[in-house]
Amino acid sequence: MFFFKTLNFFCLSLLFCTYTYSATYKKNNEFQLAKSGNVDAQYNVAMNFLNGEEGYPKDYNQAKRWFEIASKQGDASAQNALGIIYLRGLGGDKDLSKAEYYYRLAANKNHGNAQLQLALILLNSKKSDNLKEAKEWLEKASLNGNIEAKDKLREIENK
């Protein structure tokens, strides 16, 4: 009986601490910095919402909102993240044209993953004019050290 009372008390304490911790994310320094316009903090807040970490609830719409705010300030990682969100349909429907748009923004800022993902979108579109552009993005991603891009480029050239 003592064991069950102790276990019950422990579970209730843990539940209370988790609730209290998650309710206070709006008061933390990072959130306040994000609200004041700090682009790095905006990206971090978005990642916390995306993954449900650091006391933030998992909320794709809030993640998308904060990534969009950081993206408008030119943050390539936020733009890449928006590409992922729209490509996978996190928090809504998949939107390939928006994914391509955000990947292109980040790719133009030399973001290696965005360059790879943009190339893959172009390759999957099956349009012949896109093959040349896709190869160019794969080459750029390869120069950025993206191994998957190097492999894909080799695969295309061997066809």
What are these regions (language model features)?
Residues N44-N51, A81-R88, G92, Q117-N124, ...:
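Hydrophobic face of amphipathic alpha-helices that form TPR/SEL1-like repeat modules
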Residues N8-C17:
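Bacterial N-terminal signal peptides
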Residues T18-L50:
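N-terminal leader/linker segments that initiate helical-solenoid repeat arrays
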Residues W137-K159:
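Terminal, low-structured helical/coil segments at or just beyond the last alpha-helical repeat
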Residues A41, A78, A114-L116, A149:
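TPR alpha-solenoid repeat register
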Residues S36-N38, G52-E53, K72-D75, R88-L90, ...:
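Short helix-capping/linker turns of helical repeat alpha-solenoids
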